[in-house]
């Protein structure tokens, strides 16, 4: 009686199939790793650009706010100065008027 063993062609096919699956899985793993690294690099560059643009916008808004506040401050100072200038000649005219110069009870408010 002859001993029946595994078919050598079938064994060769199974070995080749397993080798091919291992080879494909190794290459697929490397492709996934390269894709992950590229994705992380692109995300990092995007994050850096986003942070730079946010810093630029904050500095731009800060500059606008500073200019606006300075401009408003100048307007307020100018309005106060105009009020003082308007008031001063009238008060000086009142002071120089001979009727009020000799009156000790006269006071400017």
Swiss-Prot record:
Domain of life of the native organism: Viruses
Family: Belongs to the tibrovirus protein U3 family.
Protein name: Protein U3
UniProt source species: Tibrogargan virus (strain CS132) (TIBV)
């Amino acid at each position: 009686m002859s001993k029946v063993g595994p078919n050598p062609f079938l064994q060769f096919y199974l070995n080749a199939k397993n080798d091919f699956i291992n080879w494909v899985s190794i290459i697929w793993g490397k492709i996934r790793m390269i894709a992950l690294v590229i994705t992380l690099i692109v995300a990092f560059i995007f994050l850096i650009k986003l942070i730079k643009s946010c810093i630029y916008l904050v500095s731009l808004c800060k500059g606008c706010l500073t200019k606006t506040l300075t401009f408003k401050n100048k307007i307020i100072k100018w309005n106060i100065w105009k009020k003082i200038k308007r008031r001063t000649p009238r008060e000086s005219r009142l002071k120089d008027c001979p009727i009020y110069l000799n009156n000790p009870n006269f006071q400017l408010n």
